Amino acid sequence: MQHPLGRFLARRWALLFLALELAVFSVAGRGFLSLNGIQIVLFYGTSLLLLATAETFVIVTGGIDLSVGYLMGFATIVSAKLCAALFRAGLSPALSILLAMVGTLGIGLVPGLLSGLLVGRLKVPAFLATFATGGIVYGISALLIGGVAAKEVPLLANAIGNSYLLYWAPGRGLSLFSRPEVARGVHVLEFVPSMVVLTAVFVGIGAWLLRRTRFGRHAYAIGGNLDAATRAGINPGRHLAAVYMISALFASLSGVIYMLEYVTGKADAGVSFLLDAIVAVVIGGASLYGGIGTVGGTVLGALILAVLETGLRMAGVQTFDKFIAVGLILILAVLIDRFFPELIHKED
């Protein structure tokens, strides 16, 4: 496929697919392109994008992390439990939330370290190591909540998780951060969810780390050719441990954001995101063989799936049909990567 049109289609198929989605759902889904519809896409996309970013780091090294969904659920429970305990101990709601977030992110690094040591030091296949870690984490999550969703979180958590950067009210104009007080029945427009901004900041840091630092270059080297990377002086064991810890950090952050948005903790909160996270990375141009992939591409893949999820729901399509669509998209992405790698991975 050396024809210019064929090359363009192979390299830009994801963008074209996104454009097709937007065109179809703008007609089939009532209100899809409205402010509310767009922000539903963004809300769904936050958890998905953070998990997909976690997967990007691992897939670039030639591995895969099957624990991120369980880690997300674990983080929702730990953050909710910590927040409630600190609040009951007499700390202010704001300080309770802040310390719970920091503590959860720190605790979340432990499963990532375990996976990294299993893969990097003991040479356990990544899918087995992370599946085992995920199972352990899920079991601990179930023990922590005893089959009941973790609650008793300060109400401020919900206010933070569902806040916006900008508000607009008739006669009041724009308001930054705080929702203006208006008379009953007056509609206030909300713009830019705060959790979307927080997600964008961390994803941006992840993109910089992977593409602009020596750490990122070493990750690509390990995924491209492990033996050559070792001969070049890279310590794969130590580096892979760090990569899986970063993956766990992003998964834990996703869980914290979920807790803030829904003010609860659930062991299975992230399970349904696992397949989508992997698919988003592949759609974004990453190779499951390692050495290729970008966070920017993952953002595009996550956006495609978030639009698909929202569009199908607004069009009244059954939930299970979404899984069929995601599976077909994954097959398409893998086939394009398999048969036209020299076209889609060649630098512009």
Language-model features: locations:
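Cytosolic-side transmembrane-helix boundaries in multi-pass membrane proteins
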Residues: M1-A23, V27, R231-R238, L308-D348
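Interfacial loop-to-helix junctions that mark the boundaries of transmembrane helices
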Residues: P4-R11, L35-V41, L91-V102, F177-V196, ...
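Hydrophobic core segments of alpha-helical transmembrane domains in multi-pass membrane transport
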Residues: A14-V27, E55, L105-G108, G134-A142, ...
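Single transmembrane alpha-helix segments in multi-pass membrane proteins
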Residues: A23-A89, L117-V124, A228, I283-G296, ...
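Alpha-helical transmembrane segments within multi-pass membrane transporters and channels
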Residues: R88-G134
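Helix-loop-helix "hairpin" substructures at the membrane interface of multi-pass membrane proteins
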Residues: I97-T104, V110-S115, S175, V186-G265
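Transmembrane helix-bundle core of multi-pass membrane transporters
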Residues: A126-R212, H239-A242, Y262-G270, H345-D348
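Transmembrane alpha-helical segments in multi-pass inner-membrane proteins
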Residues: Y244-S252, I257, E261-G327
